[in-house]
Curated annotation (Swiss-Prot):
Glycans are attached at residue 84. Keywords: Cell membrane, Disease variant, Endosome, Glycoprotein, Lysosome, Membrane, Mitochondrion, Phosphoprotein, Transmembrane, Transmembrane helix, Transport. Belongs to the SLC29A/ENT transporter (TC 2.A.57) family. Uniporter that mediates the facilitative transport of nucleoside across lysosomal and mitochondrial membranes. Functions as a non-electrogenic Na(+)-independent transporter. Substrate transport is pH-dependent and enhanced under acidic condition, probably reflecting the location of the transporter in acidic intracellular compartments. Proton is not a cotransporting ion but most likely change the ionization state of the transporter which dictates transport-permissible/impermissible conformation for nucleoside translocation. The modification Phosphoserine is found at residues 21, 23. Changing residue 317 to A: Decreased adenosine transport at pH 5.5. This is Equilibrative nucleoside transporter 3. Residues 75-105, 156-162, 221-230, 327-337, 399-415 are extracellular. Changing residue 95 to A: Partial loss of acidic pH-dependent activity resulting in moderate emergence of adenosine transport at pH 7.4. Partial loss of acidic pH-dependent activity resulting in moderate emergence of adenosine transport at pH 7.4. Its main location: membrane. The chain crosses the membrane at residues 54-74, 106-126, 135-155, 163-183, 200-220, 231-251, 306-326, 338-358, 378-398, 416-436, 455-475. Changing residue 294 to A/P/D/R: No change in adenosine transport.
């Protein structure tokens, strides 16, 4: 097979990802032997002029995770709003203390559980509700919730702390569900595009975390009032969400995007185990199932993505087990010095900025390096190896410690290095698996497969968030 451009590696409506027996054992040959995307007669494949589509998907990737990142990064604001001002000066209300100490864990559970339900609903809606409607509706809900959150910044909630906590959790539930529909719909749509566009979307998600971390540091440095800082913080997110809505509306006007967004006629679902005849891309002998006009077939998708799904789930399980519940409670060993770097800026810098920047670097690496391949046993091996990060983080200066009193790593360098390693491995390994998923199925199943891969992400986040609450209580 001749060497072709990246666009030529996209599927036709009846194509499937195939590898030879040798490439199954060769990690370096991650994406060889894909069938060509042959445009219909008389239809020329357009170019992505000025990388417009790439930039739009990158920006939408930022917007897909920006709400969650802004929520968890504004820790100082939440601690300020949720402090129990009614507690006696000489003591502390145990219930209020529980809200403060385990707020990140509660927030993580509130964000992941509704995501699971919304992903199932979104899968069922793939062929029933147009992706255009799902994206715009979910963006509208996200924008409305963020406007409510922004409006509450200047409201005095000291007399109804628990009520504000309940409102915050409800907002996170709705926000998480809408964000899930938005991100999974966009990701599923990129399954029909060349892989560089999927990579742009995924890298954009990491950039959203980096942007929120940088914005948090700037706000903390520029404003002494945590409420003014949070107001600027949330207003930034609100403005960017409006920008995302405008960029998505612009996407359909680009010739390059319209080419890959053209409707795909229902065709057979190729199992991936049969050999395609050399003289035909769609021989009737290999047709095994017809796609239902309403609900995509789930079984062949699960079968093809089982190994990649495990990798995605376990990567995000380990990540959400540690970040943010464990990371955000690791304090500087020199906190008593009174330095701003060891108090005010320590967590935003060593946890949020380093993790998100490393995550961005890991995701961006996949644009040039795609090793191990989708069928390699090394990929799940590297994924399982990340389990070692759990005890390493616990042995840092996590506070408060109730059961495990010993702090092994007596330097602030360790949490910084571990956060970077957590982010880099999360970005690279998860992006590889997410990129491979929609490319190993026929093009007409790409969007549905994207939703399924998003479900694996959410499953890992849900399991990790639930276990993080238990881990926090055990330390």
């Amino acid at each position: 097979m001749a060497v072709v451009s990246e666009d030529d590696f996209q599927h036709s409506s009846n194509s499937t990802y195939r590898t030879t027996s040798s490439s199954l054992r060769a990690d370096q040959e991650a994406l060889l032997e894909k069938l060509l995307d042959r445009p219909p007669p008389g239809l020329q494949r357009p170019e992505d002029r000025f990388c417009g589509t790439y930039i739009i998907f990158f920006s939408l990737g930022i917007g897909s995770l920006l709400p969650w990142n802004f929520f968890i990064t504004a820790k100082e604001y939440w601690m300020f709003k949720l402090r129990n001002s009614s507690s006696p000066a000489t003591g502390e209300d145990p219930e209020g203390s529980d809200i403060l100490n385990y707020f990140e864990s509660y927030l993580a559970v509130a964000s992941t559980v509704p995501s699971m339900l919304c992903l199932v609903a979104n899968f069922l809606l793939v062929n029933r509700v147009a992706v255009h409607i799902r994206v715009l509706a979910s963006l509208t809900v996200i924008l409305a919730i963020f406007m409510v959150i922004t409006a509450l910044v200047k409201v005095d909630t000291s007399s109804w702390t628990r009520g504000f906590f309940a409102v915050t959790i409800v907002c996170m539930v709705i926000l998480s569900g809408a964000s899930t529909v938005f991100s999974s719909s966009i990701y599923g749509m990129t399954g029909s595009f060349p892989m560089r566009n999927s990579q742009a979307l995924i890298s954009g998600g990491a950039m959203g975390g980096t942007v929120s971390a940088v914005a948090s540091l700037v706000d903390l440095a520029a404003s002494s009032d945590v409420r003014n800082s949070a107001l600027a913080f949330f207003l930034t997110a609100t403005v960017f969400l409006v920008l995302c809505m405008g960029l998505y509306l612009l996407l359909s006007r680009l010739e390059y995007a319209r080419y890959y967004m053209r409707p795909v006629l229902a065709a057979h679902v190729f199992s991936g185990e049969e050999e395609l005849p050399q003289d035909s891309l769609s021989a009737p002998s290999v047709a095994s199932r017809f796609i239902d006009s309403h609900t995509p077939p789930l079984r062949p998708i699960l079968k093809k993505t089982a190994s990649l799904g495990f990798c995605v789930t376990y990567v995000f399980f380990i990540t959400s087990l540690i970040y943010p519940a464990i990371c955000t409670n690791i304090e500087s060993l020199n906190k008593g010095s009174g330095s701003l770097w060891t108090t005010k800026f320590f967590i935003p810098l060593t946890t949020f900025l380093l993790y998100n920047f490393a995550d961005l670097c890991g995701r961006q690496l996949t644009a040039w390096i795609q090793v191990p391949g989708p069928n390699s046993k090394a990929l799940p091996g590297f994924v399982l190896l990340r389990t070692c990060l759990i005890p390493l983080f616990v042995l840092c200066n996590y506070q408060p410690r109730v059961h495990l009193k010993t702090v092994v790593f007596q330097s602030d360098v360790y949490p910084a290095l571990l956060s970077s390693l957590l982010g880099l491995s999360n970005g690279y390994l998860s992006t590889l698996a997410l990129l491979y998923g929609p490319k190993i199925v026929p093009r007409e199943l790409a969007e549905a497969t994207g939703v399924v891969m998003s479900f694996y992400v959410c499953l890992g986040l849900t399991l990790g968030s639930a276990c993080s609450t238990l881990l926090v209580h055990l330390i």
